[in-house]
Amino acid sequence: MDVTKIDFDANAMLDGLQRWVSCESPSYDREAVNRMQDIAAHDLAMMGASVERITPHPRAGDCIRARFPHPKAGASGILIIGHMDTVHP
């Protein structure tokens, strides 16, 4: 992925961000977490990632592994880790 070729449309970026922040996904609600994973998986795939869904436990929300093609096969890459559930007290 050549980041210099990405079209940064501020309105499109805000629309995409709005979908993410509007998706309530409490940790204890598997279906809600998976709805958030659906949004993330779709957006990552649209950016060129290969996306794999992983179900770690039948009562827990899925995990996503997204891989972007590296221009130099075998070279070191970058690992980004995060979570997509919303934490409630």
Language-model-detected regions and their locations in the chain:
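Acidic/His- and Gly-rich active-site-bordering loop/insert found
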Residues: 2-89
